A protein has these predicted regions:
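Active-site/acyl-donor-binding loops of N-acyltransferases
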Residues: 16-38, 166-217
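A conserved beta-strand-loop-helix scaffold within acyl/acetyltransferase catalytic domains
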Residues: 5-146, 160, 176
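Short Gly/charged-rich anion-binding patches and loops
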Residues: 49, 156, 182
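Hydrophobic residues within beta-strands of alpha/beta enzymes
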Residues: 1-3, 132, 169
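Conserved acyl-CoA
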Residues: 152-168
Length: 217
């Protein structure tokens, strides 16, 4: 059992401990868009060069608008997504439901990277108040290395969020603080800052739970 997204580290502390939960610090990466005139000001010089090269080499980025584009985006993402980023990847129907239920109210957007009319990358964002959250992103970087599809997908999500007046964009699920995480290193080069939050866990196997409580307390 897991509880997450608790911004206040002290919230529920006593109750969680009494019920044999243990806490692990979890990392998030957040770009503060309201502090700069352009989202790109936070990017590393190498990221800027890669974005310019990708666009110069024929890649285009825009918001998805049709059901077919969303299906093609989901199909592409399923093929390239690494289990190291997110183990439980949703079904392709999930993105169709996202389009039907959320995009109409502008609570989410899907961006696609295209090359010669083929979707080679993209990202999915959700929005709440003044914050944008990058939920999924990926690209066919091995097949289309010169177009930098994964980089363009993240860049455009940040660029669009800034243009629409969001104060922050947060990258979801970038991993444990003590484990090397390729996706976290990738997104940090877009200029975001690491933030540590607390997650509470409890396993059904008592012996394992006791061992982990001792390990993390």
């Amino acid at each position: 059992i897991e509880f997450r997204n608790l911004d206040n580290a002290k919230f529920g502390y006593k109750v969680f401990r009494e019920n044999h939960y243990f806490a692990i610090n979890w990392l998030r990466v957040r770009n503060s868009l309201h502090l700069v005139a352009q989202a790109e000001e936070w990017f590393s010089p190498s990221r800027i060069r890669q974005i310019k090269k990708g666009l110069k080499n024929g890649a285009k980025v825009r918001e998805a608008h049709t059901a077919k584009e969303i299906r093609d985006f989901a199909h592409m993402l399923h093929k390239v997504y690494s289990a190291k980023i997110r183990r439980h990847f949703p079904s392709k129907d999930f993105f169709q439901q996202l389009e039907k239920q959320m995009m109409r109210s502008r609570q989410s957007r899907i961006f696609i990277v295209t090359y010669k009319d083929k979707i080679i990358g993209g990202s999915a964002c959700i929005y709440s108040d003044k914050s944008a959250y990058l939920w999924f992103s990926g690209g066919m970087r091995k097949t289309y290395a010169l177009q930098y599809p994964g980089i363009l997908a993240v860049w455009y999500a940040l660029h669009d969020a800034k243009q629409r007046g969001y104060h922050h964009l947060e990258f979801m699920d970038v991993g444990l603080p003590f484990r090397k995480h390729g996706y976290r290193e990738f997104v940090l080069r877009f200029g975001g800052k690491q933030i540590s939050t607390r997650r509470w866990f409890r396993f059904k196997w008592e012996w394992l739970n006791r061992m982990l409580i001792k390990m993390y307390e």
